[in-house]
């Protein structure tokens, strides 16, 4: 009788490498799955390591374009910043990882999937809620959450079973990265008073090491989608990665955040999102030019709710679909070019233009070219202020009669 198959979200690190052997001991044939989300990792090495540790098959899937087009783009168009600061770096990738785990499980006839999350973080929720939404019949196993070993016990287990110990195991930081950005926690970062050491950063330069001359870039959008950088066409994934390099060189996109986790605790995280933060700022400026007032004023309510929904692991849910439907409707005329100056940690908008611009210079100007009907303001003010005037009359009369 053959063993049941299980698909493991595999990173190549100690936890998921140990998980392969741990799951084998519980009777599963393990299939490893690693996604290329644009983090720059040596994925051929990861694929081979999974097989050496004991996986019967090892998948490495390039999902950079899918991640950019179907996940990061929604976050960009929603200006999605959880609690006003966090661009949802890890939260965006988890539903895509879950989707691929389920797809491979169904392809391979697996009965279960597994992830390497602890019982303390948000990712366990994001993975398991997403997996159950996509295939309720799959069992979900969380080895790290179940075994409850200390780090020393885990290393001892790895040595006993010939599992390679990562060379960066002594690093105090826990890092997650994809093309939308890089998150970092643990070590000295657990003290919210401590300044993050420079070694905590990788994508962005320290301000004192950034160029002393600003760099001007132009980003072209079509219906809310970034299409060009300095006039050159890019796929969205390539454009984000290019912006990570350019804006990161100028120190743009460093975020230090004490956030409220889904599981009920506060956590201090350090993020680097140079491309994401530059794009969000540019996109918002183009919306300011092209959206009517009522939509522009209501959209932030949708944005905040969507950021919370994504952060809380509800990507595959009716509420997320409903919010995105509104979002897509708002992007029809968000077409144009935004000029950005990158300098000393800042992305400064210096210009914007669009064929759908609702800005009319002849209405806005105070020069002789002014075409605004000033006399129309008299009647407008009278009607606009009428409810306030009536309220004041009624309440003042009551005060007099007391």
Swiss-Prot record:
EC code: 6.3.4.5
Keywords tagged on the record: Amino-acid biosynthesis, Arginine biosynthesis, ATP-binding, Cytoplasm, Ligase, Nucleotide-binding
Pathway as given in its UniProt record: Amino-acid biosynthesis; L-arginine biosynthesis; L-arginine from L-ornithine and carbamoyl phosphate: step 2/3
Binding site for L-citrulline: 86, 122, 126, 174, 183, 259, 271
Record GO terms (molecular function): argininosuccinate synthase activity; ATP binding
InterPro entries in alphabetical order: Arginosuc_syn_C, Arginosuc_syn_N, Arginosuc_synth, Arginosuc_synth_CS, Arginosuc_synth_type_1_subfam, AS_cat/multimer_dom_body, Rossmann-like_a/b/a_fold
Compartments where found: Cytoplasm
Amino acids binding L-aspartate: 118, 122-123
Gene3D superfamilies associated with the record: Argininosuccinate synthetase, chain A, domain 2, HUPs, Single helix bin
Main subcellular location of this protein, as a coarse class: cytoplasm
Catalysed reaction equations from the record: L-citrulline + L-aspartate + ATP = 2-(N(omega)-L-arginino)succinate + AMP + diphosphate + H(+)
One CC-aspect GO term: cytoplasm
Enzymatic class: ligase
GO biological process, one term: argininosuccinate metabolic process
Binding site for ATP: 9-17, 116
Subunit and interaction comment: Homotetramer.
Family in the record: Belongs to the argininosuccinate synthase family. Type 1 subfamily.
Name by which UniProt lists this protein: Argininosuccinate synthase
């Amino acid at each position: 009788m053959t063993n049941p198959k299980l698909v493991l979200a595999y990173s190549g690190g100690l936890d998921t490498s140990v998980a392969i052997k741990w799951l084998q001991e519980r009777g599963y044939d393990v299939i490893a799955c690693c996604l290329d989300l644009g983090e720059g990792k040596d994925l051929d090495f990861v694929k081979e390591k999974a097989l050496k540790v004991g996986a019967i098959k090892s998948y490495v899937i390039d999902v950079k374009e899918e991640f950019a087009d179907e996940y990061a783009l929604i976050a960009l168009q929603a200006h999605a910043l959880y609690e006003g600061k966090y661009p949802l770096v890890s939260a965006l990738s988890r539903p895509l990882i879950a989707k691929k785990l389920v797809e491979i499980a169904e392809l391979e006839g697996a009965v279960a999937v597994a992830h390497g999350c602890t019982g303390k973080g948000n990712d366990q929720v994001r993975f398991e809620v997403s997996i159950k939404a996509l295939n309720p019949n799959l069992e979900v196993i969380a080895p790290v959450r179940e075994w409850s070993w200390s780090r020393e016990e885990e290393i001892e287990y790895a040595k006993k079973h010939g599992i390679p110990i990562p060379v960066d195991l002594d690093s105090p930081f826990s890092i997650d990265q994809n093309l939308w950005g890089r998150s970092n926690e643990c070590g000295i970062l657990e003290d919210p008073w401590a300044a993050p050491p420079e070694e905590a950063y990788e994508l962005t330069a320290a301000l004192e090491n950034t160029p002393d001359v600003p760099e001007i870039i132009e980003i072209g959008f079509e219906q809310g989608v970034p299409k060009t950088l300095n006039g050159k066409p890019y796929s969205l994934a390539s454009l984000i990665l290019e912006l990570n390099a350019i804006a990161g060189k100028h120190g743009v996109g460093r975020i230090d955040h004490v956030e409220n986790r889904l599981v009920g605790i506060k956590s201090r995280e350090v993020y680097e999102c140079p491309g994401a933060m530059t794009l969000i700022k540019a996109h918002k400026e183009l919306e300011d030019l092209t959206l009517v007032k009522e939509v522009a004023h209501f959209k932030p309510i949708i944005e905040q709710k969507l950021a919370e929904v994504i952060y809380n692991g509800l990507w595959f849910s009716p509420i997320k679909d409903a919010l995105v439907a509104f979002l897509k409707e708002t992007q029809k005329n968000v077409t144009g070019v935004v000029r950005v100056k990158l300098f000393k940690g800042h992305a400064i908008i210096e210009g914007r233009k669009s064929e759908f611009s609702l800005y009319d210079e002849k209405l806005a100007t105070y020069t002789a070219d002014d075409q605004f009907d000033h006399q129309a303001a008299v009647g407008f003010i009278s009607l606009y202020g009428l409810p306030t005037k009536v309220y004041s009359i009624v309440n003042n009369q009551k005060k007099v009669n007391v």
